[in-house]
């Protein structure tokens, strides 16, 4: 779930806003956005493109949660429909797998390191996926 924060029709740019803590903002400035953030903004761009918008670029503005406006940073790249399509294909595969095998198949599916803390299904330490998701397992192969 999410919504497009900003679309600049003149430049064809979809922009997402993120409010980050000091550590996350420092990492964003050094390494750019996470794969999850990048994919998210490309998905938003795909939605706009399907509704008729002329999308050419995506961008993320990272704002400091506790700092000043001057601490904000902006990242951008060309719109990549393939990135969004790969995400949608993975979602379809997950739906098919759980449709055939049930939700008990979820622990068998590799996860990506993500921002689980903000997910409504995240419950650290849960062992029954019928109840919730324990989040990314860094030890899983």
Question: Where are the language model's segments positioned?
Answer:
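Conserved catalytic cores of phosphodiester-cleaving nucleases, focusing on short active-site segments
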Residues: 2-28, 44
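Short acidic, glycine/proline-rich loop/turn micro-motifs
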Residues: 25-30, 70-73
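Active-site metal-coordination segments of metallo-dependent hydrolases
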Residues: 30-38
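An active-site-proximal "capping" alpha-helix that borders the catalytic cofactor pocket
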Residues: 37-49
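Metal-dependent nuclease catalytic regions and adjoining charged, substrate-binding loops involved
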Residues: 46-141
């Amino acid at each position: 779930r999410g919504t497009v924060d900003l679309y600049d029709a003149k430049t064809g740019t979809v922009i997402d806003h993120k409010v980050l803590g000091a550590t996350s903002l420092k990492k964003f400035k050094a390494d750019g956005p996470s794969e999850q953030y990048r994919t998210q903004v490309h998905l938003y761009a795909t939605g706009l493109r399907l509704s008729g918008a002329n999308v050419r670029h995506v961008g993320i503005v990272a704002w400091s949660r506790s700092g000043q406006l001057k601490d904000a940073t902006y990242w951008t790249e060309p719109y990549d429909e393939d990135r969004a399509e790969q995400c949608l294909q993975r979602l379809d595969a997950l739906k098919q797998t759980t449709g055939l095998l049930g939700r008990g198949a979820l622990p068998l599916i590799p996860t990506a390191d993500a921002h689980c803390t903000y997910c409504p299904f995240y419950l650290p330490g849960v062992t029954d996926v019928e109840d919730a998701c324990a989040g990314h397992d860094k030890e899983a192969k």
